């Protein structure tokens, strides 16, 4: 075995070892001191050491103003440690997300039970149930069937390139409303690139390719990644940022009413719709020149799409039941808490049932309802759930733990003093400023990390200004989702960039006007529609 001999002890040999002994005859090559040092001092190991080293520097050298701020200083050191590992990816992101479970108790920030509670609450339940439903949709190819049907509707004759682009983008945005935007981008990108595979490229053919063909390809890929981001803004389940915001609101203001799914939808959907319209217009102006439909029509025809749809066959019982469960979930989410005058079904349970309750309950049905494909088989089994994105679940838990630690340690109050200049500015100037700050930071860090860092500070600023905290929390969280300029901004951007159809200059050219438009719409809608939607949330 591996070039060695295996000696097995006889049953009557009491001096022989109980386990087999492997004799490896391969010579052991001793490393020199230089080789050993090169093995130890690799860039990744240096990045690993950077986290605790920076933490030690903060804890030993930083003075936040008195002995009573010791816990806040420790919290700052732990934050620096975690963000160093997140930025350098020295340690896998899910593992870094679990470090609060041991760092917070060891540094005297929070008790172990309190930290662990952050990793499993109603918001996490909402995410888990949604992810299981999304896996069911993906398993039965419902997303592909939906995309092909909608694209068929918009693929008119003669071909209208802007209209076809609208169909692809609208489908992606709709899918992203009901599942995580990264999952939506991952699921929709193969559908989009499948359509683009019919188009010729200058590298694969000797024929002269019309410039509109390449431009339309860029428009489709950009449309998918940006539509996934924009669509995710409209619902709580569309992106982790919205869930982090809800969790922080619940943590900082436990006596206030929680942000419900329907409440966020009434604000998030109009905002997302406005940004989506701008996205489509920008893509049409930049990438759909006159004559694009005529150039694309030889390669894109309804018959091609119908052929792919025919390959999927008619909808079977399992697909219909998954859609029924998904539809029931959306209805229950929207009707749990409607208005003060129309209480919704949540009143029956005295407010004890949350959106996570519904999410897990409907996901459980998938393991009970038969699929009618094989005898005894259910719509879902646990083997199909092995692709659950636990990294996102752990990241959300870390965000909630950090938010709670920043609050209880007093770090938020200390850091907010550095932004005291904002307290004297009018709200109409603060909202876009906060949004732009978040939108800038999120290009270089994950949107979840940006939200986790900024929102606690914005809460303290809002308290000092005497305004409703959500008037600053929402612009900070939404701004963190405007990662439109760089491939590294979000995983969705990476998905699009790796297709080879777009370059960084395409993202900057398209993303910059989108970022500006999003900031303007948010600055207008938050003090108007947002004030109306969130007005009933007292206890602040």
Curated annotation (Swiss-Prot):
The UniProt record lists the keyword Iron-sulfur: no
CDD domains, alphabetized: SLC13_permease (cd01115)
Tissue expression remark: Expressed in leaves, stems and flowers.
MF annotations from Gene Ontology: malate transmembrane transporter activity
InterPro entries assigned: SLC13A/DASS
Induction context: Induced by malate and by acidification of the cytoplasm.
Membrane topology: Multi-pass membrane protein
Keyword terms: Membrane, Transmembrane, Transmembrane helix, Transport, Vacuole
Keyword NAD (UniProt): no
Function per UniProt: Putative carrier protein indirectly involved in the uptake of malate and fumarate to the vacuole, probably by regulating the energization across the tonoplast. Uptake of malate to vacuoles is inhibited by citrate and by the uncoupler carbonyl-cyanide m-chlorophenylhydrazone, but seems to be not affected by sodium. Critical for pH homeostasis.
Family: Belongs to the SLC13A/DASS transporter (TC 2.A.47) family.
Full protein name: Tonoplast dicarboxylate transporter
Species this chain originates from: Arabidopsis thaliana
Gene, per the UniProt record: TDT
